[in-house]
């Protein structure tokens, strides 16, 4: 007989706490309301989230959708018991993928799965999601919280995000006029962002440090906290530069695969990106990872952003205007390389210089 009473088993006996789920919804409602924007001003709790595209003031929009997760960076958050920033990563990974196509993020939905729901932990995660939805200008219109005992170990959870944006027809990126001699600008990252954390965790294991140790690469910070530095969101600076200058031909979000996997995705087949590694300002975290793990430069470049979280392709005569527009919004911009003719069978990304790790 169930311990819950003489009437047999309950859902709670099976490990699912409906009351905890309801409590979480109440806890996150103020954060969700704070993300309202034109077109997205409904309440959570319905069977589906609503968005009024007409109210967003587009004339002839094309919708752009993206979804992503945070990967094994979550394992550090779980082990370090620090959950406030992973929601930021979740939003960033999705909305940065929208803006590279010239799209303005409109709305966001999240999926939070766990073995046992902790409403306070869930509220911390959703609070991070809501904060960065505000930063990106998109409404958090819904989501799913799944308590799944037996699917996840105690304390473990996973996150997925889904974002939809829009661009006016004819304004999507990349444009069709990328040419030899165009300049590649690099926008600084905030750290490791949300890729390569299986390797990061392996290196930390080899180092013998734990998450509460002092970070060897960051003064007055704990290792776990420093590695959880959230992914930078580039949306508003890039949208402003796109609209003010009309000069950005392509953007690439430097995520898993680094330069060699991500930059060629936005280039025509006859062109390659020549990257000047001497221009890359490598943050200390990457130098520590490379030295501690004995990771070669080529492997670093195909695993991590190495200090450049986004690139933009512009004509040489527009470098100053685009750089100034981005810097006015707080971005750190470097001249990273240029477009060259790609020989048949050659790689889409080639390097000169040396990565300073």
UniProtKB/Swiss-Prot annotation:
One of its GO terms (biological process) is adenine biosynthetic process. GO terms for molecular function: ATP binding; phosphoribosylamine-glycine ligase activity; phosphoribosylformylglycinamidine cyclo-ligase activity. It holds the Pfam family AIRS. Pathway: Purine metabolism; IMP biosynthesis via de novo pathway; 5-amino-1-(5-phospho-D-ribosyl)imidazole from N(2)-formyl-N(1)-(5-phospho-D-ribosyl)glycinamide: step 2/2. It is found in: Cytoplasm. Its main location: cytoplasm. Gene3D superfamilies: PurM-like C-terminal domain, PurM-like, N-terminal domain. One of its GO terms (cellular component) is cytosol. Keywords: ATP-binding, Cytoplasm, Ligase, Nucleotide-binding, Purine biosynthesis. Its EC number is 6.3.3.1. InterPro entries: PurM-like_C_dom, PurM-like_C_sf, PurM-like_N, PurM-like_N_sf, PurM_cligase. It is an enzyme of class 6 (ligase). It catalyses: 2-formamido-N(1)-(5-O-phospho-beta-D-ribosyl)acetamidine + ATP = 5-amino-1-(5-phospho-beta-D-ribosyl)imidazole + ADP + phosphate + H(+). Belongs to the AIR synthase family. NCBIfam families: purM. This is Phosphoribosylformylglycinamidine cyclo-ligase. It comes from Rhizobium leguminosarum.
């Amino acid at each position: 007989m169930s311990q819950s009473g003489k009437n047999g088993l309950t859902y709670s006996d099976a490990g699912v706490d409906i009351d905890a789920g309801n409590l979480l919804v109440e806890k996150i409602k103020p954060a969700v309301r704070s993300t309202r924007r034109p077109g997205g001003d409904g309440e959570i709790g319905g069977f589906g989230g609503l968005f009024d595209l007409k109210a967003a003031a587009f004339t002839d929009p094309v919708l752009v959708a993206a979804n992503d997760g945070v990967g094994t960076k979550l394992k550090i958050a779980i082990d370090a018991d620090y959950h406030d920033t992973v929601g930021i990563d979740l939003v960033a990974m999705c909305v940065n993928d929208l803006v590279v196509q010239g799209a303005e993020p409109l709305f966001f939905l999240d999926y939070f799965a766990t073995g046992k729901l902790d409403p306070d932990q869930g509220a911390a995660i959703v609070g991070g999601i809501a904060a960065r939805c505000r930063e990106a200008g998109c409404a958090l219109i819904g989501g799913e919280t799944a308590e799944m005992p037996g699917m996840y170990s105690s304390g473990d959870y996973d996150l997925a995000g889904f974002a939809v944006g829009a661009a006016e027809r004819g304004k999507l990126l990349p444009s069709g006029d990328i040419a030899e001699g165009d300049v590649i600008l690099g926008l600084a990252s905030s750290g490791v962002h949300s890729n390569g954390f299986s390797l990061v965790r392996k290196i930390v294991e080899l180092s013998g440090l734990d998450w509460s140790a002092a970070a060897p690469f960051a003064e007055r910070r704990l290792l776990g906290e420093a590695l959880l530095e959230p992914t930078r969101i580039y949306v508003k600076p890039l949208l402003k530069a796109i609209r003010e200058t009309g000069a950005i031909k392509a953007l690439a979000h430097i995520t898993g695969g680094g330069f060699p996997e991500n930059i060629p995705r936005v280039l025509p087949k006859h062109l390659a990106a020549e990257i000047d590694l001497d221009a890359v300002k490598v943050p200390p975290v990457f130098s520590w990872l490379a030295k501690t793990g004995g990771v070669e430069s080529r492997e670093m470049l195909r695993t991590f952003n190495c200090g450049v979280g986004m690139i933009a392709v512009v004509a040489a005569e527009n470098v100053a205007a685009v750089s100034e527009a981005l810097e006015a919004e707080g971005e750190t911009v470097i001249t990273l390389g240029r477009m060259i003719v790609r020989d048949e069978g050659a790689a889409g990304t080639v390097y000169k210089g040396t990565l300073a790790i």
